[in-house]
Amino acid sequence: FNLDIPALQNSTVRKAIAMAVDYDAINQNAMTGQSPTFADVPRSCMNPTPGEQASFDHDAVKDLQWIGNDLDGANAMLDAAGIVDSDGDGWRELDGQKLSLNACCPNGWTDWMAAMEIVAAAGEKIGIEITTEFPEWSVYQTVVTAATQTDYDIFMMWTDSATPAQPWGRVRMLMSSEFNGVEGNWSGNWGHYSNPDIDTIIKQIPVETDAAKLKELYTEAVKIYLIDVPSFSLMYRPDKFHAVNESVWTNFPDSEDGRNIPPSDCTDGYGIAALYDLELVNP
């Protein structure tokens, strides 16, 4: 969410949109079912791996999570906040202005484009006009990395993948105000969210050595993310996709085979171990 846009400075509007999106449709259409759903792994700031999922208290944030396509809940939330359609044109107003937004991603990035169409469809179902726009990447990357911008309201970027700095690096990337006001910002928080409480947590995590306290800090970070909704994940998107052709060779690595061989490239690092286990289909 671009928090330079007045309408999106309202957290009720942000959360209602996030609640209304059909994430299962995104999983099936944009991801072709190749990642966990939010029903499988409820949303947080963490990726779906066991290590990151163990870093926070799931029960403490359970009531703050949503799995999507909750049109009744989103509409009720907007109604309760007085964000209603007062002139009967089918679109809600906020502070006397029609809620009309765009949803953007680079042209040709077909999985992202499919996701943005689903976001736009969700807006229509809760009385918020959302129109998709797909600029070329050369333009897009200049706009979203600017210190401020009012061209794109809802737009897609990425988060950190799996590294030793996670999940701290991802919390920082999603919410740290240190990136605000920076021209050519490729580091994160492209929506320009600012919250001194999360900034304090981001500073505390790297120097905290007590495991219980660290879990408390991560849990509080997840709470802030789910309550304020500065951005929202559309999918668990792998950094790499893995596919094999088993017409000639078989017994490629699998996450559940107990061998713990990284599957992304059988000629890189410990991935080479996979070559020793391959079996000819017709020896």
Where do the protein language model's features map onto the residues?
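Detector for C-terminal structural segments
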Residues: 18-58, 111-120, 145-283
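Thiotemplate assembly-line natural product biosynthesis machinery
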Residues: 70-75, 118
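Ligand/substrate-recognition segments at binding pockets and active sites
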Residues: 65-67, 83-161, 190, 211, ...
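Well-structured core secondary-structure elements of compact alpha/beta domains
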Residues: 1-3, 188
